[in-house]
């Protein structure tokens, strides 16, 4: 719907203009620029054929339209707010209607300069296109009225009024909404040094929060991966440690340091091949003691910090051929070499290995018998006897050929590697020959794991089921000896202490341990003489009446 503005000098100034429609408009209402510098035109009769000037609302993006008018300055100023509410009208009025003044020219120039500048918030291209089509000369604006025809469209209505018609049929935004919109638009623009708008702040806060969340998740993922890797590394090290403690890495960790002169003889090639077959690491070089072999253990790098002091193998092997050994014995240098080895390695066990010694001696004796010469048999037996009687941790070994020598050295290397991780023997440890546990015994696995059960089974005539009965009542030797050492009990009470223990029968039911077995266990454990036989102990040998502190 189009709104018309009727402008006439003859109308009453108090007559209100038609009100604008309250319906929302699509395009903003154009402003009207009114200049009353020209004299007021005379009102024409209705029947006169006067062509009015139509000033349409600007169809482009500018909000200003310019209309020449001659409203009085005072009347226009007083009724501007009432008559033109809803329209934006700029009046170029002057006190003198006939002659232009410098103030009016300056005022017009400032207004036109404002018209040339594009309105804030609109596109520059639309504003430039508009000013190209509605160019208004700046000179002599108060005298020349032809500029109004350049910005207007001609039409042929019969009215004598100046109508302002909008080219848009529907406008959805009112002037109040436009003003409000412009206010919001100007306030929402970012100004340097001021806080950002709430919407933009909230958007940026969301973005930063999401980025922080992503970084936190990434950091947590990396921490989990690092902890997982550390846990896997810890488990791997623990596994390697257990392997090392059980001796599974012993053969790979031992290194045989062989003197170069050992490999110069006939046993060199065969010995190297045997080491290669077993996968044992060797190091060939000059040793402090000639013709010697020593061993060292290298701990894997992963578990080396767990064992600051690696295992030490206190063993040294001297390898001699038969002829060389006989010459050393004949010259009296062999015992000197043994003394020098003990001085250098005081805690080491020394072994002297000879190859084909006895066959070489017999061969030379036969030759000497057939062709007598200067050769005499060296005192081999006396020297070997002295090794046993005069030296500690020194012994000898004789091999019949090179194969046996190589086999002995390789086997000795394997044994030295594994013995470092074997359980140490204790006072209650029983050798395999002394453990009288039948193969079909139900509790043989339990007995093998307990030194106390092994010690009980080692006592003659003490069956495994008897030992289990004692073990259930007294789970350790200390608990039983504590009762045996009690001064308040007599020897008779101590001897028959175990007679009433229940023993599981072979065919079911429980039987008593008995007086004989109880007395045997007591006398064997409390005997002061370890050299007597068990039968003598049972019969009363080494009785305890004379022992101090025993009732």
From Swiss-Prot:
Basic and acidic residues bias located where?
Answer: 202-239
Q: From the UniProt record, which GO molecular function terms apply?
A: DNA binding; endonuclease activity; metal ion binding
What does the record give as cofactor? Mg(2+); Ca(2+)
Q: Where is the composition biased (Polar residues)?
A: 37-51
The molecule here is called: Crossover junction endonuclease EME1B
Similarity comment: Belongs to the EME1/MMS4 family.
Name a single GO biological process: meiotic cell cycle
Subunit details: Forms a heterodimer with MUS81.
* Localization in the cell: Nucleus
Q: What does this protein do?
A: Interacts with MUS81 to form a DNA structure-specific endonuclease with substrate preference for branched DNA structures with a 5'-end at the branch nick. Typical substrates include 3'-flap structures, D-loops, replication forks, nicked Holliday junctions and also intact Holliday junctions with a reduced efficiency. May be required in mitosis for the processing of stalled or collapsed replication fork intermediates. Plays a role in DNA repair and in genotoxic stress-induced homologous recombination (HR) in somatic cells.
The residues covered by the ERCC4 domain are: 287-484
Supply the CDD domains for this chain.
XPF_nuclease_EME
Q: What PANTHER family does its record include?
A: CROSSOVER JUNCTION ENDONUCLEASE MMS4, EME1 PROTEIN
The GO cellular component terms are: Holliday junction resolvase complex; nucleus
The protein's UniProt keywords, in alphabetical order, are: Calcium, Cell cycle, Cell division, Coiled coil, DNA damage, DNA recombination, DNA repair, Endonuclease, Hydrolase, Magnesium, Meiosis, Metal-binding, Mitosis, Nuclease, Nucleus
Residue ranges for the region (Disordered) are 1-55, 187-239
Record-listed E.C. numbers: 3.1.22.-
- Chain segments annotated as coiled-coil in the UniProt record: 203-253
Membrane-spanning ranges:
none
What coarse category fits the chief subcellular location reported for this protein?
A: nucleus
Q: Pfam families from the entry? A: EME1-MUS81_C, ERCC4
């Amino acid at each position: 719907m189009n709104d018309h503005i009727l402008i006439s000098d003859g109308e009453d100034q108090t007559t209100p203009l038609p009100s604008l429609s309250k319906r929302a408009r699509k395009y903003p209402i154009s402003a009207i620029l009114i200049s009353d510098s020209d004299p007021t035109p005379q009102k024409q009769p209705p029947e006169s054929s006067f062509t009015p000037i139509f000033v349409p609302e600007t169809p482009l993006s500018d909000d200003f339209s310019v209309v020449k008018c001659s409203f009085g300055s005072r009347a226009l100023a007083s009724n501007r707010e009432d008559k033109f509410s809803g329209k934006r009208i700029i009046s170029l009025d002057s006190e003198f209607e006939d002659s232009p003044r410098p103030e009016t020219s300056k005022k017009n120039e400032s207004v036109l300069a404002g018209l040339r500048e594009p309105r804030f918030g609109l596109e520059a291209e639309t504003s430039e296109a508009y000013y190209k089509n509605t160019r208004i000369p700046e000179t002599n604006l108060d005298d020349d009225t032809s500029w109004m025809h350049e910005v207007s469209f001609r039409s042929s209505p019969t009215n004598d009024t100046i109508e302002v018609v909008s080219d848009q049929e529907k406008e959805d935004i009112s002037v109040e909404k436009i003003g409000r919109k412009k206010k919001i638009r100007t306030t929402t623009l970012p100004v340097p040094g001021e806080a950002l708008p709430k919407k933009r702040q909230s958007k940026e806060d969301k973005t930063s929060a999401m980025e922080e969340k992503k970084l936190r998740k990434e950091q947590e993922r990396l921490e989990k991966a690092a902890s997982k890797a550390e846990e896997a590394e810890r488990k791997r090290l623990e596994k390697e440690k257990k392997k090392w403690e059980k001796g599974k890495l012993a053969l790979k960790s031992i290194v045989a340091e062989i003197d170069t002169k050992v490999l110069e003889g006939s046993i060199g090639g065969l010995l190297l091949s045997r080491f290669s077959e077993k996968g044992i690491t060797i190091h060939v070089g000059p040793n402090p003691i000639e013709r010697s072999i020593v061993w060292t253990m290298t701990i894997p790098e992963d578990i080396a910090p767990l064992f600051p002091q690696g295992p030490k193998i206190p063993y040294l092997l001297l390898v001699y051929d038969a002829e060389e050994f006989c010459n050393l014995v004949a010259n009296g240098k062999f015992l000197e070499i043994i003394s020098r080895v003990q001085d250098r390695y005081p805690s080491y066990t020394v072994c002297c290995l000879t190859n084909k010694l006895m066959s070489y001696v017999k061969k030379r004796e036969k030759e000497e018998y057939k062709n007598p010469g200067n050769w005499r048999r060296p005192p081999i037996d006396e020297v070997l006897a002295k090794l046993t009687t005069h030296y500690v941790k020194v012994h000898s070994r004789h091999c019949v050929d090179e194969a046996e020598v190589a086999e002995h050295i390789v086997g000795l290397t394997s044994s030295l590697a594994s013995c470092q991780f074997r359980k140490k023997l204790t006072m209650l440890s029983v050798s395999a020959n002394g453990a009288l546990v039948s193969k079909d015994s139900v509790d043989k696995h339990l007995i093998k794991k307990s030194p106390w059960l092994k010690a009980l089974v080692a006592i003659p005539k003490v069956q495994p089921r008897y030992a289990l009965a004692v073990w259930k009542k007294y789970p350790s030797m200390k608990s039983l000896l504590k009762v045996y050492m009690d001064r308040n009990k007599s020897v008779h009470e101590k001897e028959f202490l175990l007679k009433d223990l229940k023993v599981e029968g072979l065919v079911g039911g429980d039987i008593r341990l008995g007086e004989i077995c109880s007395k045997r266990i007591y006398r064997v454990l409390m005997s002061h003489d370890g050299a007597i036989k068990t039968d003598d102990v049972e019969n009363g040998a080494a009785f305890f009446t004379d022992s101090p502190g025993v009732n």
